[in-house]
């Protein structure tokens, strides 16, 4: 058997909805309606977002390469952004008049909730073994989601 394993990190893109807490489509949707963008906690949490097209390209490389047999790869983008910076960027790129509303964790989540402060994938292995790197930056991801949602 020719097994390969991947771990996806915050894959986003057009057609994705924010119903399950996905922050990028949720922010874009709110910004397009000029509604407030809700940032939980301090907004200092660090995340990275990978365009679905980049993730699909990586997955095809993993499936097609004999070098990937028996290996585990992280698929994601390591361009870091704080949630607060993301909110500001979404407002800017969509031309929105939205405001940013900070909400304390205690008001949004049950007692004992702990948010991961930094989630950044190590993609050095997939780069080294298969030569893959993400090509689509965060600005373009936001623009793609906004364009799709504006249809």
Predicted segments, located by residue:
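Conserved small/polar residues in nucleotide/adenosyl-binding loops
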Residues: 1-2
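Short aromatic/basic micro-patch
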Residues: 5, 49, 80, 120, ...
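Conserved C-terminal active-site "lid" loop/helix of NAD(P)H-dependent oxidoreductases
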Residues: 52, 72, 106-133, 137
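Amphipathic terminal alpha-helices
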Residues: 125, 137-151
């Amino acid at each position: 058997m020719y097994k390969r394993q991947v771990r996806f990190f915050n894959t986003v893109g057009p057609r994705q909805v924010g119903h399950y807490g996905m922050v990028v489509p949720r922010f874009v949707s709110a910004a397009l309606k000029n509604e407030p963008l809700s940032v939980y906690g301090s907004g200092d949490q660090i995340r990275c977002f990978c365009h679905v097209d980049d993730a699909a390209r990586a997955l095809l490389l993993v499936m097609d390469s004999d070098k990937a047999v028996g290996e585990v790869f992280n698929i994601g983008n390591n361009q870091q952004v704080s949630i607060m910076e993301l909110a500001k960027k979404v407002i800017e790129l969509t031309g929105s008049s939205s405001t940013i509303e900070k909400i304390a964790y205690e008001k949004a989540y049950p007692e004992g909730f702990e948010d991961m402060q930094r989630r950044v994938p190590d993609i050095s292995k997939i780069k080294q073994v298969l030569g893959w790197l993400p090509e689509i930056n965060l600005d373009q991801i936001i623009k793609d989601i906004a364009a799709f949602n504006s249809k």
